[in-house]
Amino acid sequence: MAELNSPLILGGLHLKNRVVMAPLTRSRATDERVPTAMMAEYYAQRASAGLIISEAVVISEQANGYLNTPGLFTDAQVEGWKQVTQAVHDQGSLIVAQLWHVGRVSHPDLLNGAAPVSASAVQQKGQVSLLRPKRDYVAPRPLEISEIHAITEQYRQAAVRAKEAGFDGVELHAANGYLLDQFLQSSTNLREDEYGGSTENRARFLLQAVDALIEVWGAGRVGVH
């Protein structure tokens, strides 16, 4: 059996050991979703791991559902991430960016008054995290096919920006009830077009997003959660 501290080849990544840090949202970015010096320090403190998967990173203004989570859709955000990736690399570790769109798990107060979007108009239960006074989630607006294609392109653009920011790869967040998972689940995907119905159709958005990331990074540096 290999020892925990022994090197590991994981796809196209060469890890110094077999310890991988899971993504953990900290909400320490600026109001403009720019990574901060505190974030660079936080990740550097954990860079004894062979690989760090970053906290979830929103791919657009529409993609967010929480306060002060970082993004990868502006030049300022790219510059902010550079201090993080450099701090991790200085410790001999690797870091990949987890790309994120929350879909219906948001609120108009976080989206400049716009409705959140999803596969179908199925409302998220409960109340929005950390907003005060407390607010219930609202029914999302179903995405048009052209908008699905546009979001796929936003995933690709975020992957390009991740490379510019010094990341070593990307991971697609497709779980935990967020947008891609909303398309995968028959309880939240009631569509009757090419993105709904069969398992193949419900997985179409996810697989197209994966292809978009591979176009930028190659298959060896793309993961799916």
Task: Briefly describe each language-model feature range.
Residues 1-23, 47, 88:
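N-terminal amphipathic alpha-helix/helix-capping segment at the start of soluble metabolic enzymes
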Residues 18, 56-112, 145, 150:
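Acidic/aromatic-lined carbohydrate-recognition and catalytic surfaces
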Residues 18-20, 51-53, 94-96, 169-171, ...:
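Structural preference for beta-strand elements that scaffold enzyme active sites
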Residues 21, 46, 88, 97, ...:
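Conserved, mostly hydrophobic/aromatic
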Residues 24-37, 66-74, 104-108, 134-154, ...:
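Active-site mouth loops of central-metabolism enzymes
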Residues 39-60, 165-169:
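Catalytic domains of carbohydrate-active enzymes, especially glycoside hydrolases
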Residues 69-96, 187-221:
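Alpha-helix-loop-beta-strand connector modules within alpha/beta enzyme cores
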Residues 86, 100-161, 165:
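Non-globular sequence segments
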